[in-house]
């Protein structure tokens, strides 16, 4: 209402693709200029400098950016001082064959699709949204102000019991073929699931012949968002192919992109611009933008779904942003739910989140051993051993020889391999907790154990050792120079929007 009345007027500080640092510098007072002006001027030239630099120079430029970031974020502001690790996504000159051309790998993907199928189901929170729409506008009703409806949902109190119950049902849900068969609406995406798959074998020939293993590292979505983050890097041909695939999957030529570039972080803008934008309050305009205010929200009683439409018919919605859907706030979270109404939590990946869902409570003060879980050649869980931290800390002696002997005894007692990934479990996991990434450790290497000793947090409650797959000699990727490196494939599974389709 404030926007519509003109009482609040959005002011876009800079436009997408524009260098923000000169504009930021122009807003500084003389005192601020003396303090920050030199840094902002250097940042303004950074993009051009990186583009012209060779590898070592580019790394040094990024390291200088790291040091600047560490000065900007003091201790305590975001939980801990940033680690200073920056990376850049780069295209590779080396060409790769499509792994799905190999029949054994394609069979792995088929098996995974069959396992995950009943776990990719319409969410209960989407059902609640439909129920509340019908209570306001009736079965088959039409809402002429979709933004107002979504904002009404967003302003529900924190203690909304129905919302909490629906969210809990989604988190705890198991396989449900009936809910997997429910439609997601004309505006929504097809059912989808992305999987990070890692090949493991002593040689590429062995793997192509059906030997070795395929590890399911993690799940994500498969609506095109992970590919969209690279569309500016890979060019217009890639962008057009991806946009065409999205329209085909949605089953309509008109798919609008929810471009939440102002939400949470400035990195959101990286993936924007693949499809015509849905016009939202505070977002930059575009010539092909379709304002949300020009659309109607409609209930389809035959499918118990909602969709957006105008006089020309229904329109699809796609959210391709970097910020995960569950972290979006306000009305955006409900608008994105309309575009992606699926719950996707199959327990067939070796990711931190998937492992945590297996626990009914806190980790016990005893050793937990979990066997490797397999389905054919697929590894859906690596073998792991979780110890109370108090049992591991005394083994990490200042004398490296003593540490090596202690670790050798531990390995023999529990059958732990030499190469492992190590997780540390902290007693308190607040909003800024980011210790999900494991550390590779060679338990027979003094240097590796010394690094582990310095890495483990004194406050850690438990330490997990997870078998390293792939281990040395089992990585099937190749660098541009032909050196072995780790390879990981992102495979997208989509089920057609018509009922009964296979992935």
Annotate each predicted stretch with a short phrase.
Residues 3-268, 433-438, 445, 451-503:
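Type-3 copper protein
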Residues 218-473, 478-480, 487-501:
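C-terminal structured domains
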């Amino acid at each position: 209402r404030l926007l519509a009345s003109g009482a609040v007027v959005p002011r876009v500080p800079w436009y997408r693709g524009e260098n923000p640092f000169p504009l930021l510098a122009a807003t500084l007072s003389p005192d601020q200029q003396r303090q920050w002006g030199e840094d902002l001027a250097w940042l303004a030239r950074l993009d051009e400098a990186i583009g012209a630099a060779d590898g070592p120079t580019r790394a040094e430029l990024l390291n200088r950016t790291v040091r600047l970031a560490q000065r900007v974020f003091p201790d305590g502001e975001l939980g801990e001082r940033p680690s200073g690790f920056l990376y850049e996504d780069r295209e590779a000159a080396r060409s790769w064959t499509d792994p799905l051309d190999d029949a054994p790998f394609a069979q792995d993907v088929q098996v995974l699709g069959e396992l995950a199928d009943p776990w990719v189901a319409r969410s209960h929170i989407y059902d609640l949204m439909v129920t509340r729409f019908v209570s306001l506008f009736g079965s088959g009703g039409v809402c002429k102000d979709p933004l107002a409806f979504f904002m009404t949902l967003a302003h529900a109190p924190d203690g909304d019991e129905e919302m909490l119950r629906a969210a809990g049902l989604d988190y705890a849900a198991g396989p449900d073929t009936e809910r997997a068969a429910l439609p997601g609406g004309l505006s929504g995406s097809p059912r989808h699931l992305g999987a990070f798959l890692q090949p493991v074998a002593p040689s590429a020939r062995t793997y192509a012949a059906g030997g070795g293993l395929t590890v399911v590292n993690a799940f994500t979505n498969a609506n095109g968002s992970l590919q969209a983050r690279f569309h500016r890097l890979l060019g217009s041909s890639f962008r057009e192919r991806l946009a065409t695939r999205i329209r085909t999957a949605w089953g309509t030529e008109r798919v609008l992109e929810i471009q939440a570039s102002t939400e949470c972080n400035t990195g959101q803008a990286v993936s924007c611009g693949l499809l015509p934008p849905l016009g939202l309050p505070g977002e930059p305009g575009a010539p092909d933008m379709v304002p949300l205010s020009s659309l109607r929200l409609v209930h389809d009683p035959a499918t118990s779904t909602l969709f957006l439409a105008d006089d020309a018919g229904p329109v699809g919605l796609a959210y391709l942003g970097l910020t995960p859907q569950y972290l979006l706030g306000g009305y955006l979270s409900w608008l994105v739910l309309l575009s992606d109404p699926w719950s996707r939590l199959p327990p067939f990946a070796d990711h931190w989140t998937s492992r945590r869902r297996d626990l009914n409570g806190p980790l016990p003060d005893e050793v937990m051993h979990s066997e490797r879980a397999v389905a054919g050649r697929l590894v859906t869980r690596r073998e792991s051993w979780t110890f109370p931290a108090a049992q591991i800390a005394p083994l990490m002696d200042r004398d490296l020889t003593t540490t090596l002997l202690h670790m050798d005894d531990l390995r023999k007692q529990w059958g732990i391999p030499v190469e492992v990934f190590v997780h540390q479990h902290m007693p308190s996991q607040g909003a800024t907790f980011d210790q999900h990434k494991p550390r590779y450790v060679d338990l027979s290497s003094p240097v590796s154990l010394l690094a582990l000793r310095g890495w483990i947090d004194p406050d850690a409650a438990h330490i997990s050792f997870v078998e390293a797959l792939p281990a040395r000699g089992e990585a099937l990727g190749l660098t541009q120079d032909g050196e072995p490196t780790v390879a990981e494939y992102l495979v997208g599974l989509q089920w057609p929007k018509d009922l009964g389709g296979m992935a």
